[in-house]
A protein has these predicted regions:
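Ser/Thr-glycine-rich phosphate-binding loops at phosphate-binding pockets of nucleotides
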Residues: 6-14, 22
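Short, solvent-exposed loop/turn and secondary-structure capping segments
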Residues: 14-17, 94-96
Length: 656
């Protein structure tokens, strides 16, 4: 059975008098209220159970397992799954209690950079698995509630108020706690009613893609072979998407990287007037539906001549090459350093993560990235040692993408229909959200890493705080990596193809969008090679004009439209953005907590582990900068146009 739980917590904060920073060893946190409800399509407040301490919560969960077990049939052990909306936070209170007290064992934990789930086993053998509902719905409970039409119950919660068991929680405050569990309960029940059993967006979308593309393939049956018969597992897949052998998958992962986020140094921190923005309608779904993608296992060609390799690169859709002794430098400041393959820090110079210069490197490149390299870089030396030639199939996932594109389009019509009922509009919001998840989240599974740094949680008796122990885990391939490589490579090439149309008038790109000057906008509007349409899948859509704009770095810029200023700043909550002033908007800009509080706003909340669990500590914000940069030290160079141009000239001159 599945349930949804939520915790409200309180804390005792102790600050170091010398530094005024939180003393995490002397502070403490604990659960002061909890609520739990079954997953049900029409959540009933009468079904909610509540309590005040983490101990009472775990006791209730233990008893709940036993109660479910009474109704379990045959030899099957009961299954109890509990979802919380932000398990990284809530889970620490559970793990602290069981690891310190010994009331239960942590028998399984799936945690890489983030916590996905964990299973605990009580002393009587009861097992409970906790999942993070944010991995299914990565938005706030408030936004999910609006999507599902759940009205807010009476009540609110004052997070500045200290509450131990002696402090009564009012009915209005309990109403606030109940609200969140009811929202997630309904949303999760809705997903289950649609047949989505997986516990992350990516897994849901990937398995839906399999169901709609390879209806006769049952991956659950194949998974039974994985542990003891890996070759049998591989060959149970349809030929088109049979996972590559381990060594080949591990090697070709070096050809897989994401979208291009790049600020032209020429425009860094420059006050611009009349900039224009375009983005691609569903860039990645378009590549899945409308472009040739690889199928099956590759033909491997050893030690081809450069002429033979280039013939394959430019005449076939899906080719990967191994390149050795690679020394390249960007041609000049007008060209785009859109290569991101792994390099040694002592052999490469990078800006914004992109390669400006490298020497004697090894790379694994798709043919689309190879074309970018030949267009934008001076190649001083290069040897192609292997070519991996894949068969290709166009429209491999067209049925899957077009089905959900139609779902999204139909939902948009209802959302914009003035005659639609509130219930119809609510259903359309849910339908649209699911369609977007399906189209945009499935391909990433194919690029899953094999060697992953996993973290296990331990209790440190000396500090009375939870800690992480890192270890590498190796997994066998269970996805078809070449799909992810070429979906992303095709997407990068589309953005690159737009950028080279405008060259000097290119300002900024971020994965599926570009910003250009007014002169660049005129070039794009008149170019037969720039496909613009307000709706069509894969076409560029015009987002609008920025009256003024300032771009500081990747994912950090400000613009005005209709006399209203907007900030896009990665990692900054809305309260921080409201505190920003354009005169100070530059690398190294600091917004102190005092400045934020003067405006009546809340600072950025950072989790700090303390005895008992976690405290969310308010902090200010700083736009990062690059200090003490040296060539070939493995760090990015500053976004400085003069330095950028000088480095390129000097490095190219060294080879003449």
């Amino acid at each position: 059975m599945e349930f949804v739980a939520d915790f409200e917590t309180t804390s005792v904060r102790v600050y170091d008098p010398k530094t005024n920073k939180l003393d995490k060893l002397k502070s403490k946190a604990f659960v002061c209220a909890w609520a739990i409800i079954p997953v049900e399509i029409n959540p009933d407040p009468e079904h909610i159970q509540k309590g005040r301490t983490i101990q009472s919560f775990l006791s209730y969960v233990n008893n709940l397992y036993r109660e479910i077990g009474k109704h379990a049939s045959g030899k099957h052990h009961p299954k109890l799954s509990i979802y919380t909306h932000n398990l990284k936070f809530d889970g620490d209170f559970i793990l602290y209690e069981i690891l310190k007290s010994g009331t239960a064992q942590l028998i399984n934990e799936v945690r890489e950079n983030v916590l996905y789930n964990f299973t605990i086993k009580f002393l009587d053998g009861s097992e409970v698995t906790f999942f993070d509902s944010m991995k299914i719905f990565p938005i706030s409970a408030e936004k999910i509630g609006k999507m599902y039409g759940i009205k807010k119950l009476y009540g609110d919660w004052d997070y500045t108020k200290y509450r131990d068991e002696s402090v009564e929680i009012t009915s209005q405050e309990w109403g606030y706690v109940f609200h969140d569990v009811m929202i997630i309960s309904k949303a999760l029940a809705d997903y289950r009613s649609r047949g989505y059993r997986e516990n992350t967006q990516a897994a849901i979308a990937y398995n839906e893609r399999l169901r709609r593309t390879y209806a006769k393939f049952n991956k659950l049956v194949a998974m039974r072979l994985k542990k003891n018969n890996y070759e049998g597992f591989r060959k149970a897949f349809p030929f088109d998407i049979m996972p590559l052998p381990f060594d080949l998958h591990k090697h070709l992962l070096m050809a897989y990287f994401g979208g291009i986020s790049w600020l032209n140094p020429k425009y860094a921190c420059v006050d611009l007037v009349d900039a224009h923005s375009y983005d691609v309608h569903s860039m990645y779904p378009d590549k899945m539906a409308n472009f040739p993608l690889p199928v099956g296992q590759p033909v491997i060609i050893e030690n081809p001549t450069l002429e033979e390799a280039r013939r394959l690169i430019y005449n076939y859709d899906c080719v990967i090459v191994d390149v050795e002794d690679l020394s390249i430098t960007l041609k000049d400041e007008r060209h785009f350093p859109f290569l991101m393959f792994p390099t040694l820090g002592t052999k490469s110079i990078r800006m914004q993560g992109k390669i400006i210069d490298c020497k004697n490197e090894m790379a694994v490149l798709s043919n689309w990235d190879f074309k970018i390299m030949e267009s934008e870089y001076n190649i001083h030396s290069m040897k192609i040692t292997k070519v991996y030639l894949f068969r290709s199939k166009k429209g491999q996932y067209a049925n899957f993408i077009h089905f959900f594109m139609e779902q999204k389009t139909a939902a948009d019509k209802v959302r914009n229909d003035p005659n639609a009922t509130p219930e119809e509009k609510q259903n359309a919001e849910v339908q649209r959200s699911i369609a977007k998840v399906m189209m945009n989240s499935s391909y990433g599974k194919d690029g899953t890493k094999l060697i992953r740094q996993c973290n296990s949680t331990i209790y440190n008796k000396d500090s009375d705080i939870l800690e992480q122990q890192a270890k590498d885990e190796i997994a066998m391939p269970e996805y078809y990596l070449p799909s992810a490589i070429f979906i992303c490579a095709r997407a990068r090439f589309q953005l690159f193809s737009a950028a080279i149309l405008v060259r000097d008038d290119f300002i900024y790109s971020d994965t599926d969008s570009i910003k250009v000057t007014s002169e660049g906008n005129e070039i794009l509007k008149n170019s037969p090679y720039f496909d613009v349409d307000p709706y069509r899948l894969g076409a560029w859509g015009y987002e609008g004009k920025y009256d003024t704009a300032r771009f500081v770095r990747q994912k950090t810029y400000s613009y005005t439209q209709n006399d209203e200023r907007h900030y896009t700043v990665c990692g900054a909550p809305e309260s921080i953005k409201k505190s920003m002033k354009i005169d100070d908007f530059k690398p190294g800009m600091i917004i102190t907590l005092e400045q934020i509080h003067e405006m009546g706003l809340e600072g950025r909340l950072l989790p700090v582990r303390v005895p008992g669990g976690v405290i969310l500590e308010e902090t200010g914000f700083q736009i990062s900068t690059v200090d003490n940069w040296d060539e070939y030290n493995g760090r990015n160079m500053p976004i400085d146009f003069q330095l950028f141009r000088d480095i390129i000239k000097r490095k190219n001159a060294n080879y003449k």
